[in-house]
Amino acid sequence: MAIVSAPRQGRQAPHRTKPQMAAFTTLLILAAIGVLLLARDVLPGSSRSSGVQGSGVAATSTRALPNFSGIELAGSNNVTVVAGARQSVVVHADSNLLSHVTTQVKAGTLIIGDVGRFNAKSPMYVEVSVPSLTALDLSGSGNVTVTGIRASRLTVTLPGSGGISASGSVTRLDISVDGSGDAQFSGLIARNVDAVINGSGTIFVTATQSLDAKVPGSGAVLYGGNPAQVTTSITGNGAVTPG
């Protein structure tokens, strides 16, 4: 007598009831809403960005501060610096956002930052006039423009992603770029330049006597001024070239 075995049936997926399907769909919708809300909060400049909305009325605030010879940009604001007989710091922003730009002096250095979330409608920047400038530090993401500087020595550090340009003349320029920002100093005539670039940015300088350039990163140093002495040390993928 032949015995016929019945074919085995494949394992069936568990059946979801209607209440389970409804709960699952609700969770997906809530997750999608959460993602949209998060994107709204973290995208600056968006019409939906969280925080204080600018009034659209441009205003200024003149800050009374102790004397300083160094400037540190810790926020995302743009800063213009000019050589002047008198020291002054003027903040430009929407009338209701002036307090979001912070200015304080510590150990002879003006520190410019910003606090809170906001969506500016009017141009937001800081104007600085200083009789003597010896140091610049761009740890934030803003941009700095310096004009008319005359100094025996200027030290510049750029660890952030911002950019800086400068014009004038100095005896010695020490500049270090650790981030991805660019330093446009071809308009600043320096007798001696010491340039170090650890990041991926670019340094433009004009050296009339000597240039000491170190490039352990992937950035580049481009120089003009036809210096009599050029010393280079390249250990990364970067370059030091006249241009």
Where are these regions (language model features)?
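Extended, compositionally simple hydrophobic/Ser/Thr-rich segments
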Residues: 60-64, 68-81, 100, 109, ...
